Amino acid sequence: MKQTSLSWRMATGVAATVLALYASPVMAGNEAEVAEHLIELVKIGRGVLSEQMKNINDPAKADKGFTGDYMSSQVVERFKKSTKLDLRIPNVVPQANLYLALVQAEKEVVDEAQPIINKPGISFKGFIPAVFARRVGEQFYKKSGVRMKLTGIDYRNANNKPDDFEAEVLRMFNDPRHPKGQSYVRNTMVDGKPVLRMMDPEYAGPTCLGCHGSPKGERDVTGMKKEGWKEGELAGAISVVLPLK
């Protein structure tokens, strides 16, 4: 696996010094773009993990070589490719401290999972993209005060249960009149404080159907009942609650 670079270590060092400063909310004016970038970082990290599923679940191997450093370096590299923002040079990226806090959360989640990732003799570890995203959201909230989660009508984990706002938006996403793939954003109040809420719809792809497809009610590899999804149907959304000034 590719090892993390010196520039990434420097960037994470900068992040460590500014994480405490990110108790301050995001300035109004660019908050929607910030939320979009946070969603992109989660999607990238989840994609990196998805590529590693066969490696992680190989019962014949012990050390898989899939580390937090590998995750963070891949996320930073792919984020630059998709957004033209280079988090290895944080002083030139607006809100770099916030983005780096999320990358650090992704790194930590992979590092914490090393004992199970590298345990031989097990063909399914349970460290799947949905679990990764949930743990990253929990870690990131502790660092930043920004809430991020996967949610959906057919949620499996209670932490992914949609709140009233999310349930309303999910119904809108499921309406055939809503443009497929179009996110939804609203400035509102949560607990008496101004926030930006963004939800980005996600649709069932081929890799989702092994656990969530047909036949409905059949047990999947995790022991849960399949939901009977079909490819292209609404699977859920990534939800962001971003505090504002």
Task: Give a label for each model feature.
Residues 1-2, 222:
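Intrinsically disordered, low-complexity regions enriched in Ser/Pro/Gly/Gln/His and often acidic
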Residues 204-216:
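The canonical Cys-X-X-Cys-His
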Residues 4-5, 199, 214:
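Compositionally biased, intrinsically disordered low-complexity segments enriched
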Residues 15-16, 26:
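Cleavable N-terminal signal peptides
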Residues 27-203, 217-245:
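Extracytoplasmic c-type cytochrome modules immediately beyond a signal peptide or single-pass transmembrane anchor
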Residues 2-14:
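Bacterial N-terminal signal peptides that target proteins for export
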